[in-house]
Amino acid sequence: MEDGPLPDLRDIELKLGRKVPESLARSLRGEEPAPREGAADPSGVGGSCSSSSSCSSFAPSVSSSSSSSPASGSPRRSHPSALERLETKLHILRQEMVNLRATDVRLMRQLLLINESIESIKWMIEEKATVTSRGSSLSGSLCSLLESQSTSLRGSYNSLHDGSDGLDGISVGSYLDTLADDVPGHQTPSDLDQFSDSSIIEDSQALHKHPKLDSEYYCFG
């Protein structure tokens, strides 16, 4: 039997719903099996005579019967051989029981190891599921952030290139005017409009002026 600490069998008893046999528990603890009461005496003599008087009274009868019937000696000779065969069978049976108990002990230890391995694997699976859920939530947040950024950039680009929207055109024009104001010496379209209006007004005023006439008249006769 393998030497080692006594395993705790309460977990297995709770899972199986049955109590571990006492003989198996004794085998696990390394104790010897309890002796059975009323075991047969291998010599075959003990228990046959209760007192010396009965044995002495039994001996003459046996001798007289043996002297009277000489042919009855063969069953008496076969009786010790039958006891020997029975003792041999009992010894073999006890040895097989010891081997079975040792096998049960090994199986019980293997079951305990398997139970611990299953518990550790279950714990690892639960931890992996927790890490996977956290990773999926983080990846989902990152994907949503990237999608929102790409959508906003695409919308801004489309609004800049969409000429059908008057508001966008005004906003783009005002933005360009603002940029032109920042550049020194650059004339904006509004400055050109003011320049053309002022030149037209000056030309019209020059046309409306009357020519200056001399006050002296010359008469030719």
Swiss-Prot record:
Biased composition (Low complexity): 48-75
Residues where N-acetylmethionine is found: M1
GO biological process, one term: regulation of signal transduction
Residue ranges, compositional bias (Basic and acidic residues): 8-21, 28-39
Alphabetical UniProt keywords: Acetylation
Signal sequence interval, chain numbering: none
Region (Disordered): 1-81
Keyword Acetylation applies: yes
Protein name according to UniProt: Leucine rich adaptor protein 1-like
Species per Swiss-Prot/TrEMBL record: Rattus norvegicus
